[in-house]
Design a protein with these regions (language model features):
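Conserved SAM-binding motif I beta-strand of class I
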Residues: 132-137
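S-adenosyl-L-methionine
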Residues: 138-183
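Conserved SAM-binding loop of SAM-dependent methyltransferases across substrates and taxa
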Residues: 118-130
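Non-catalytic substrate-recognition/targeting regions of SAM-dependent transferases
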Residues: 3-5, 12, 28-92, 100
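Mobile active-site "lid"/loop adjacent to the S-adenosyl-L-methionine
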Residues: 142, 164, 181-213
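Conserved class I S-adenosyl-L-methionine
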Residues: 108-117
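Helix-to-beta-strand junctions that scaffold the AdoMet/dcAdoMet cofactor pocket
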Residues: 218-219
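C-terminal catalytic and target-recognition region of SAM-dependent MTase-like enzymes
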Residues: 209, 222-273
Length: 273
């Protein structure tokens, strides 16, 4: 199977490995037919279709890395996307509704972006009028990418800081320093065993601790967006008891996504005293 995503005037066509094996010639013919079908259905030129597929007979290298990249526009914001080189493009389309909600509500807010990836939520917040922000991730690659996205949108990095840190450690330090935010986005991976982290991350196991840490930084009338893409995920009952939680997944997943379980998303607030 393939996933077809439209980025402006380009199509990102990604093959998913099901273990189905074909001879090399048969496989190449099949790929050509897939591209021909996409051209027919979408009307895009073959030159604007970026095929990301399994390389064959290339040892441990699983995907082609041709490295073509360029800018993409979303709701008036500019983003640097790479449609060929990496498994991900730099901009997850399934969260474009959530990004717009952040941009629409950021005016005058202090914003925090945890597990920030390439900083797209911060781009929306900053261009939406946030007075300050902190963008936190452990990956230098993604933080450099975020900086590039900031530059594309004229965002001042003195006012909108990019911070390399383990999120667990950041939450502890920020709480000790008395930092407060009005709007927080936390979109962690389902699992991570990065050597840069002191411990592994298992979002089902660890999400309550992460949410508690984020809520300790959230102003009394603030809002946390918490999301993840673990299909089997269930929100900890203690979290639902401690805070006001609202599942907005049906609104956050765009209508044009066939897979309505591509992520789950909650609005979380402090309970009124």
């Amino acid at each position: 199977p393939f996933a077809v995503d439209v980025y402006g005037e380009h199509i990102h066509l990604q093959e998913y490995d099901t273990g189905w094996l074909m001879a090399d010639d048969e496989y190449e013919d099949w790929l050509a037919q897939v591209i021909e079908a996409v051209v027919f259905v979408t009307g895009f030129s073959p030159d604007d279709i970026h095929l990301k597929h399994r390389e064959r007979q290339k040892g441990t290298q699983q995907y082609e890395k041709t490295g073509r990249a360029g800018e993409d526009f979303e709701h008036g914001r500019r983003f640097w996307v790479n449609l060929d080189k990496y498994l991900d493009t730099g901009l997850f389309l399934d969260h474009r509704n959530t990004r717009k909600k952040v941009g629409d509500s950021a005016e005058g807010k202090r914003f925090l972006n945890l597990f920030s990836y390439t900083g797209s939520f911060t781009v929306y917040a900053a261009t939406g009028g946030a007075v300050s922000s902190e963008t936190v991730d452990l990956s230098n690659t993604y933080l450099d990418w975020a900086k590039r996205n900031f530059e594309l949108n004229g965002i001042d990095t003195a006012q909108h800081q990019i911070i390399r840190a383990d999120v667990f450690q950041y939450l502890q330090t920020a709480s000790q320093e008395g930092k407060r935010f009005d709007l927080i986005v936390m979109d962690p991976p389902s699992f991570s065993n990065s050597k840069k982290m002191p411990d592994t991350l298992d979002i089902q196991r660890d999400h309550a601790r992460l949410i508690d840490g984020a809520m300790s930084l959230l102003d009394s009338d603030g809002l946390l967006y918490f999301s993840n893409n673990l299909r089997s995920f269930t929100l900890n009952e203690a979290v639902a008891q401690r805070y006001e939680t609202k599942d907005i997944s049906k609104q956050s997943v765009p209508d044009d996504f066939r897979n309505k379980k591509i992520h789950q998303c909650w609005e979380i607030r402090h309970k009124a005293v």
